[in-house]
Amino acid sequence: MFRPKLLFTGLAALALGACSPQDRQAVTSAAIAKQVILPTYSRWVEADRQLAASALAFCQGTQELDAARADFLKAQRAWAELQPLLIGPLAEGNKAWSVQFWPDKKNLVGRQVEQLANAEQPVDAQSLAKASVVVQGLSAYEYILFDSKPEIADAARKARYCPLLSAIGERQKALAEEILASWNSADGMLAQMTKFPNQRYADSHEAIADLLRAQVTALDTLKKKLGAPMGRLSKGVAQPYQAEAWRSAQSMHSVRASLAAAQTVWVGVDDKGLRGLLPSEQKALADKIDAAYATSMKLLDDNDRNLGELLSSDAGKQFLNTLYDSLNVVHRLHEGELARALNIQLGFNANDGD
């Protein structure tokens, strides 16, 4: 009996099996762009829209401080998830610095926020866009909500900081919307990661290489975000104020969110991630990377202490060293064996020279 559906399925399977490596890379690039990157950018936009609304509500007295802080934490998490996906317009120029200023080795955030808050002319979103990136993003917003003394909920303090808080919320919303619109434009990143050749990529292999470079840079940055406060970059002297999001005690949560996003690029949705590009003879490498991610994620999931608490005890420091070493394994596997298996020359990453 003739079964056209089964025949079609069989032909499709044969066609898929006959796909060239280039075709598989094009499918993977498009899948990661549509199923991983674009949804993450969309969540970032929604979080920043809520942040802008939250700043306005808090400053108008219709939202409590705890709720304002919760909205900030959502925006912080959305940004952490985005960091392994920094390719295209957000990775160019100083746009990422405009979202979050880190590392801040000289407390520039605190000093410059106070200068703006004390200025005679109140800042607005338009003037903030022309100001230093130090005060445009989440680090400055975090300072106002978590570190300004006395409590920001005090009416007099609100009057002083609220113009800047509202301006940051609007600036972040506008920046996120601009980036997402650029991604979705006719010749934007979504199109460039889907159809080849184009102005950015001569072929799909270049797009996959760009994705891997972003992963390697992000994983290296995660190590730095742990290593700097641990003292690995300062002769063993702990530097807790060098941590990302230390004021809100969210450093460990941000590390986990970023690592989970990197793992999603590796695994993909419906197995259409970088992992799926490895041939069957590279199963041992795929298993090794799976295990490395699993080790790091378990360490993070089993931990319920913030970074400051971990740095204050010998047991906590040992845990951080174990976590750092596990992240190093993930990073080195991507930088070395995975890059070679995919025939990708990485060159320098964005952290080289830091």
Residue ranges: model-predicted function:
Residues 16-18:
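C-terminal motif of bacterial Sec signal peptides marking the signal peptidase cleavage site
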Residues 1-8:
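Bacterial N-terminal signal peptides that target proteins for export
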